[in-house]
Amino acid sequence: MVTKEQVEASLTSKLKPIHLEVIDISGGCGSSFEVEVVSEQFEGKRLLERHRMVNAALEEEMKEIHALSIKKAQTPQQWKPPSQDSATLTKDA
């Protein structure tokens, strides 16, 4: 069984992300994951190439993972960190 921590460790060691989010969407059985990866290594690469890089970084884990959803594979310049202000409601009334 692949763990969230294993996926995080492999992506961190191979892609050196400045932002990484891994979510086990299989209910804890380690068969399905969603990932967001922001890495300088994606500079100059098209989206398909970036996805291939993520899959290559998880080569060993992919032998046991049933599904991998790559939600984001962005460069630091493309990535916009979640803003604390976005949760604030404005008063227009």
UniProtKB/Swiss-Prot annotation:
Name of the featured protein: Protein BOLA2
Q: Which GO terms describe its cellular component?
A: cytoplasm; cytosol; nucleus; plasma membrane
Query: Which residues does the annotated region (Disordered) include?
Result: 72-93
Matching entries from InterPro entries are given as: BOL2, BolA, BolA-like_sf
Q: How is it modified after translation?
A: Can be either glutathionylated or forming covalent homodimers, depending on the oxidation state.
What domain of life is recorded for the organism? Eukaryota
State the Pfam families in the record: BolA
What does the UniProt entry state concerning the protein's domains? The putative nucleic acid binding region (34-77) coincides with the interaction surface with glutaredoxin.
Q: What does this protein do?
A: May act either alone or in interaction with glutaredoxin as a redox-regulated transcriptional regulator, or as a factor regulating Fe-S cluster biogenesis. The GRXS17-BOLA2 heterodimer binds a labile, oxygen sensitive iron-sulfur cluster.
Localisation: Cytoplasm; Nucleus
Q: Quaternary structure?
A: Homodimer. Interacts in vitro with GRXS14, GRXS15, GRXS16 and GRXS17, but not with GRXC5. Interacts in vivo only with GRXS17.
Its keywords, alphabetically, are: Cytoplasm, Disulfide bond, Glutathionylation, Nucleus
Family, according to the entry, reads as follows: Belongs to the bolA/yrbA family.
Q: What is its main location?
A: cytoplasm
Q: Does the keyword 4Fe-4S apply?
A: no
Source species: Arabidopsis thaliana
Q: Which residues cross the membrane?
A: none
- SUPFAM superfamilies hit by this protein: BolA-like
Among its keywords, does the record have Disulfide bond? yes
GO terms for MF: 2 iron, 2 sulfur cluster binding
A biological process from GO: protein maturation
Sites where S-glutathionyl cysteine occurs are at: 29
